[in-house]
């Protein structure tokens, strides 16, 4: 228990230092971190769910190579979310924000049967959340932002104020050599009143999202 707590604390300190650095250097690093790990072909590639936010004001395409088949990676994606398998990122930082996250290092059978319409939370009730828009096991998962109050998927078109429309997509591209490219993409549209907020959130999302990809790789390769 003590060892686990120290590990979480150490990772959180590293994550916090990275957050500070990326926030300060965001204007210079923005193009790099929004394409972290992805090839030009992957950035340009059309993915399921792209049509849900047709004119994104912000977004990214990131990718990582995992040395195992898609079947070994999918279970970790299927159980993603608060109150499920976690978000595989800096747990200590997430919980400082009140997200009540507990990341698992096990495959949880009770969360493997993911269905369209399922709710995926990033924190407790009232925090950002998503609905499963489409799911193709061992291949593709598309989430669409839901209203934190009603937990219903939002409209495709942004409203004037206090509104964000977003998709979050995971795509597994299995290669002939037995490795798999895990591609993650987010497309975001928002009202003008939220522009500054999202510009501040963007570099934070990179640090947390990068850690998520690295952790999923570690977990999947460990079980391969």
Each model region followed by its residue ranges:
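Hydrophobic ligand-binding cavity/cleft-lining segments
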Residues: 6, 10-121, 219-224
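Hydrophobic pocket/interface hotspot
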Residues: 73-76, 132, 182-184, 216
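Short strand-connecting beta-turns/loops that link adjacent beta-strands
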Residues: 69, 137-138, 175-178
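Short, hydrophobic/aromatic-rich segments at coil-to-beta transitions
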Residues: 113-117, 135-143
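Hydrophobic/aromatic beta-strand elements that line small-molecule binding cavities or substrate pockets
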Residues: 62-64, 130-132, 166-174
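Intrinsic-disorder/low-complexity, polar/charged segments enriched in Ser/Thr/Lys/Arg/Asp/Glu/Gln
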Residues: 59-65, 140, 165-167, 179-181
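A mature extracytoplasmic/lumenal domain signature
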Residues: 136, 145-147, 186-188
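Beta-strand/loop substructures that line and gate deep hydrophobic ligand-binding cavities in soluble
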Residues: 43, 150-210, 214-218
């Amino acid at each position: 228990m003590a060892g686990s707590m120290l590990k979480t604390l150490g990772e959180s300190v590293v994550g916090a230092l990275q957050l500070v650095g990326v926030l300060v250097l965001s204007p210079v690093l923005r193009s790099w971190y929004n394409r972290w790990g992805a090839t030009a072909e992957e950035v340009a590639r059309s993915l399921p769910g792209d049509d849900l936010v047709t004119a994104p004001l912000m977004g990214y395409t990131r990718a990582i190579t995992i040395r195992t088949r898609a079947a070994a990676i999918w279970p970790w994606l299927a159980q993603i979310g608060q109150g499920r398998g976690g978000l595989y990122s800096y747990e200590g930082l997430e919980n400082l924000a009140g997200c009540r996250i507990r990341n698992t290092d096990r495959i949880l059978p009770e969360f493997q049967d993911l269905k369209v319409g399922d709710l995926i939370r990033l924190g407790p009730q009232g925090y950002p959340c998503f609905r499963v828009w489409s799911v193709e096991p061992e291949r593709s998962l598309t989430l669409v932002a839901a209203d934190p109050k009603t937990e219903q998927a939002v409209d495709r078109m942004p409203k004037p104020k206090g509104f964000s429309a977003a998709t979050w997509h995971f795509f597994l591209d299995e290669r002939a050599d037995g490795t798999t490219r895990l591609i993650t993409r987010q497309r975001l549209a928002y009202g003008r009143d939220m522009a500054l907020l999202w510009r501040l959130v963007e570099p934070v999302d990179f640090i947390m999202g990068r850690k998520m990809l690295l952790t999923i790789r570690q977990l999947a390769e460990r079980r391969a």
